[in-house]
A protein has these predicted regions:
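Solvent-exposed, non-transmembrane regions of integral membrane proteins
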Residues: 1-418
Length: 418
């Protein structure tokens, strides 16, 4: 019996050790990159993905048990564990369908999101009363199965409506033009062709049913406060450990990059945005991401630039600055990503759907987390650390704009002209 207990303890020490943790983070990064590169529709790829994240959840659970007294540590790690468990268990119970509704007849059938050839009934039907192009809003009536109107409401982008556990989200619209025989009765005359036409609008809705969303919200909340904890503790450590002049130069470069990107980033300055971008979450999400991009880019530049110094003490100061600012960058990135998840729920009914953009955001986040854990205790040294940051910066660029050119982004909800 004692031998069994000792073997279990030894297994927990190894599984919760830094080597296994780094290995599983690297594996999770690799399968996430593969998912972000190609359309994800093969069973073998899905099994590999779920197995890797299942092992990551197991390692996280062991690590949390070994560090249960550390408040800030538990907030972030238990939060991530809850999110992964939600993704593994809850995702199988998520129902996601598309429905196109018009003004002429009540629609009661919807197609499966992943398998458009499959149709089913959500338990109610919808009739479109009117559609506003400027706001992408639909005036709809919802009917029960016996034909009784149970709700009349307006569905707008970023403001879904809930009916019988289903969230009805506004996704877009379709305009169809019909040629009519009689001008007075059916429409307007087209002077170029000499025919008579009538326009009809169809609203594209997404129906989402996710009974596990409270579990996801719990994990997101814990991760959010864990990210805040990491940000505050890293800032305090930076103030204590770094020289004033070096910190001033480093911070000035990061802030300059932040301002430059803000000045030349079109969505921040165009007066007319797409309806999905007209959200109170837009400004904080974009600002946090641009700031973390600026900080992490600066960290990469200085990680490479420190090799030009012959003075080893100065190199060590710069390396310490790089480590601290990567900590700040990953904390801010975590906050921005979680705000984006909340925004996604408002817009599309789900916190996370492994959209191409979301997949690359997760891959970038995992690689910077790998760097953060690998540099703790200097488990990897330079120049390996500089090479890792360079690779992470490439992933960051792919997440920002490169993903738009990938085959996996053809159906992405994040690819749009702002």
């Amino acid at each position: 019996m004692e031998n069994i207990q000792e073997a279990v303890k030894q297994m927990f020490r190894r599984v919760g050790g830094w080597r296994v943790s780094l290995f599983v983070m690297l594996m999770a990064f690799m399968v996430t990159v593969v998912r972000g590169l190609v359309p994800w529709n093969t069973v073998s790829c899905l099994v590999a993905f779920e197995a890797t994240y299942g092992f990551l959840a197991f390692v996280l659970g062991v690590v949390c048990l070994r560090n249960w007294r550390r408040t800030g540590f538990l907030l972030s790690h238990v939060g991530l564990l809850v999110v992964i468990v939600y993704g593994a268990i809850g995702s199988r119970e998520i129902k996601r369908m598309k429905m196109t509704v018009g003004t002429e007849e009540v629609q009661s059938w919807a197609s499966d999101y992943d398998h458009p050839e499959r149709y089913s009934q959500p338990g109610f039907s919808i009739l479109l009363n009117g559609f506003s192009i400027s706001t992408h809003s639909s005036d709809i009536s919802v009917f029960s199965q016996d034909g009784k109107e149970i709700l009349r409401t307006v569905v707008t982008v970023n403001s879904p409506v809930e009916v019988d556990g289903w969230k009805i989200c506004q996704m877009g619209y379709e305009e169809k033009v019909y040629e009519k025989e009689y001008e007075k009765e059916y429409g307007e005359e087209d002077s170029s062709e000499g025919g008579v036409f009538s326009k009809n609008y169809f609203s594209k809705l997404q129906l989402v049913r996710d009974p596990w969303q409270p579990c996801a919200l719990l994990g997101i909340t814990m991760l959010f406060f864990g990210g805040l904890w990491l940000l505050v503790t890293t800032l305090l450590r930076a103030r204590k450990d770094l020289h004033g002049s070096s910190l001033y130069v480093f911070s000035s470069l990061a802030i300059t990059l932040f301002i430059a990107v803000c000045m030349f980033y079109p969505p921040l300055w165009r007066k007319q945005l797409m309806p999905v971008l007209r959200s109170p979450w837009f400004a904080p999400h974009i600002a946090l991401y641009i700031y973390c991009y600026a900080v992490l880019t600066t960290a990469t530049i200085m990680a490479v630039g420190q090799f030009f110094f012959r003075d080893m003490k100065r190199r060590e100061v710069w390396q310490k600055m790089v480590d601290l600012f990567v900590g700040i960058g990953i904390a801010v990135m975590t906050l921005g990503m979680l705000i984006g998840a909340i925004w996604a729920k408002d817009a599309w009914g789900l916190y996370w759907s492994w959209d191409a953009k979301e997949t690359w955001a997760a891959a970038t986040w995992l690689l910077y987390l790998f760097f953060l854990h690998a540099r703790k205790g200097k488990r990897i040294a330079y120049p390996w650390a500089a090479g890792l940051l360079t690779l992470a910066l490439c992933c960051l660029q792919m997440c920002w704009w490169g993903v738009n050119y990938l085959p996996s982004a053809q159906e992405s909800l994040h690819v749009y002209d702002v």
